[in-house]
Amino acid sequence: MNIEWISVSPGKVFIGSDNRSILFGGVGPRHEVKIDYDYEISYLPIDIEVAQEIIQSEDCFIASESEWTLAMENKLISGENEVEELSDKIRGSYWSKYCDGRPFIEENWIMKVCRTWKSGKPSISLIPRHESCNYLRLVRRNNKDNFNSSAPKLPDSSNKSRVLFEELLISLLFGIIPSFIWAHFNASPGYISEGWLNLVFGGLFIGVISATFWRPKTKSWRVGENCGKMKII
């Protein structure tokens, strides 16, 4: 098979979502990746059987999500109606990811990062571990020693205490307080003193359900210009 290889210059891209609502959110955190090396990427997705033969016989790799995104943002690659599998594999977040262009394979991963093409436009998609795609996107890296442990890296996990405080505050402001206000004007006398626990749990429930549609944007991360460490934007 004659593969068209496209050269990609070093650059920066943002990966991930800052929206953590259940319905509209994506995998987070949103973070910058700095790719310092040149590489070549296949212009089109390659049939998986052909791609596997090429990987075995040539110095090629499955493209990482970061490499794919940098090429896509520079309008260097294309597709038609394929679902292509990238080399990143996640459990549910990007925490602990090295942000230098290498593939991110999370411990105990359960989903494969993919791109779905429809009418020439790609969208982010995730498929379960046991499923496979019919296409891969390949890259050829000019330098085999691009990655090391001193590269910028996201923290191992989110600030759980901050997330918990945010959830409690949302439940208080949008669930519990409105429940008591409603009861004050509409419920029978004595209901608040006798049924306050129901109002609290009802407010908490409303707060939790609101996560389906909305949550405040999460912090994004960038690569520091001088220190080479990940910093909150």
Regions found by a protein language model. Give the residues of each.
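Extended beta-strand/loop cores of jelly-roll/beta-sandwich
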Residues: M1-E73, P122-I233
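An exposed tryptophan-centered "aromatic clamp" motif
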Residues: L70-E106, Y191-S193
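Alpha-helix capping/hinge segments and adjacent helical runs
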Residues: S93-P128, N134-L136, R140
